[in-house]
From Swiss-Prot:
<protein>
    <recommendedName>
        <fullName>Protein asunder</fullName>
    </recommendedName>
</protein>
<keyword id="KW-0963">Cytoplasm</keyword>
<dbReference type="GO" id="GO:0005634">
    <property type="term" value="C:nucleus"/>
</dbReference>
<dbReference type="GO" id="GO:0051642">
    <property type="term" value="P:centrosome localization"/>
</dbReference>
<feature type="coiled-coil region">
    <location>
        <begin position="521"/>
        <end position="550"/>
    </location>
</feature>
<keyword id="KW-0131">Cell cycle</keyword>
<feature type="region of interest" description="Disordered">
    <location>
        <begin position="578"/>
        <end position="619"/>
    </location>
</feature>
<keyword id="KW-0744">Spermatogenesis</keyword>
<dbReference type="GO" id="GO:0060814">
    <property type="term" value="P:posterior mRNA localization involved in anterior/posterior axis specification"/>
</dbReference>
<keyword id="KW-0175">Coiled coil</keyword>
<dbReference type="GO" id="GO:0160232">
    <property type="term" value="C:INTAC complex"/>
</dbReference>
<dbReference type="GO" id="GO:0080154">
    <property type="term" value="P:regulation of fertilization"/>
</dbReference>
<dbReference type="Pfam" id="PF10221">
    <property type="entry name" value="Mat89Bb"/>
</dbReference>
<keyword id="KW-0217">Developmental protein</keyword>
<dbReference type="GO" id="GO:0051663">
    <property type="term" value="P:oocyte nucleus localization involved in oocyte dorsal/ventral axis specification"/>
</dbReference>
<dbReference type="GO" id="GO:0046843">
    <property type="term" value="P:dorsal appendage formation"/>
</dbReference>
<dbReference type="GO" id="GO:0051301">
    <property type="term" value="P:cell division"/>
</dbReference>
Amino acid sequence: MFERNQKTIFVLDHTRYFSIASEEYISMDFLKGKPSADGGATGAAGNATGGGGSQFSKSLWTCACESSIEYCRVVWDLFPGKKHVRFIVSDTAAHIVNTWSHSTQNMSHVMNAMVMVGVPSRNVATSSDYSVIHGLRAAIEALAEPTDEQLAAMADLGTDELPRIPNKGRVICITSARDNTSMKSLEDIFNTVLVQQNALAAPPAKKGLVIDHCHLVILNIVPLGVESLVTNRSLLKISPLLDVEIHTVSAPDISYKLTHLILNHYDLASTTVTNIPMKEEQNANSSANYDVEILHSRRAHSITCGPDFSLPTSIKQGATYETVTLKWCTPRGCGSADLQPCLGQFLVTPVDVTSRPSSCLINFLLNGRSVLLEMPRKTGSKATSHMLSARGGEIFVHSLCITRSCMDEAPSITDGPGGRVSDYRTAELGQLIKMSRMVPLKVKDPSAPPLARRLPRYFPLTTSSSILFHLQRHINWLPHFLHILVKEDMDKQDEVRCQQHIHELYKSASRGDVLPFTHTNGARLKLSKAKDQYRLLYRELEQLIQLNATTMHHKNLLESLQSLRAAYGDAPLKSEPGASLLRSYTESPLSPERLEPITSGSASGSSNSNSLLKASKRRMSSCGQRSLLDIISSAERSQSNKRLDFSGRLCTPLGQVAKLYPDFGNKDKDSVVTAASITPNVKEESVRS
């Protein structure tokens, strides 16, 4: 509830140095005169006449006051009554401009107080009594004072639970220091006073609230064109109670710096509305396009954008932060079907409230009109992502849903990657989830972990990837048979019933009956004989029984099925117990087999099916005996055996290091090699001649 941006205190340096000019001169033209020829030139402070106009320059104090008041205006516009900002002016003493009371948290009170303070006088002699430290001490004392919200929380909790009330804050000090040493001294004094204040707030004194944490931002401002010896520094943790960051900025750019800081302090975002059609002030018959920058919560963009959208950003001239550019959308008539649902609304305030484009946009919205804003898609098209409208004298930005919303129908599960799939076993998956459901018990059930590991091991996602589960739609007794197989408490009667069903399959295979399924993935099953179909069915059935062989009745069923397979001419090879289990939940019986190369003499259909079954059996019997590391290691060894090993490894004794290029640099060896390379060339020349 009480965040760090709940309390913000501005400490303004009111010493003599802040009375000097900022050295940014502004041309002021008379109504009936012409603009001065050197309107943008710089000169001495004061009035400089030239042509038909004059120039003036703001003082450092004026720049600091204007930018800090704009900061608090943005805060109070976007968080009315929720965030508090105080001002303290420091010269020979600390002057409190306003308090935490809501009656002083408004623009009129602050501006009237600043007018009474006035610009620092240049006639005052320089003295050590003029210091910003007075204001920093008063700021720490102000942080210890409770706000109205904290007072209400204290009343609810009671005086015994005061330490539970969070109390964090931020102090923004606008001053001017000579060098880094002076800035370091300022940090140390602030940290010392902060610790002393917490000591006073602790029992038994209890003078105010304990400050949990403080964020000190020091803005070192200088006139335009003046180099400062104070270096910028990012956020640094001085102590568990204090974080400090330092920014050196010229006086004309302090407003951009504070706008940049307020984005991070209050989690805001900048949006520039571009291409706003507006009548020109001097020519009412023509119009021009203008841009207006507004500030709002960052969530206005984050909840709108999806993976198909990218925010168009740009950096304003003179600023250091990014702003999102959204285009003004010409109002058009649309029905209810064209309106997007609103994901959220957030208060909006313009950056430059006194400019003519901002004033025109605000009046346009306050008169009951709405503005749609467009953002580009990655595909090149555009989408209406935001809407500006006003209600009750306040302007809001509405984030519109440009992606699939929760009110839209969910995408079909059949339209997945790889094409359209229409035979997902959704009902069976629901039954599996019900069977795998666990409930908390006071005493641990030792049978629960095996159940969780056993049930999901073999579950084909689609009907077309399994013969056994495909046939349960066509064979009446098969669903009940599969249900009995997964029972943990199978009895003798269930075993006899299952054996009868297995014998029925054997009799059907003996008669040569074709299994009652016709299509797999929309095409006919490519098996030449009914015998091959039964072999695949027996194989999958054996895998399923092995997974559920938890009782003696399951093992009897497994032995009965294996004996039938042996009588049928498809006896399983002996392998490790883990081989078939690994095969059961890694591949389905209809997965493509890795066939051996077929010679020209064995290209018949029956030999193809036999090789299919043999390859499948070989893979089932051997895949569980080798791990992935064994497979990769054997592949690397087979590749390394194809080429000779490094001679240094072969010739160097164990424990010694082989020397690369031992003959490199040996002149005798080089001469021998050179002579050996020249001799064949001489022989070739003699042969050619």
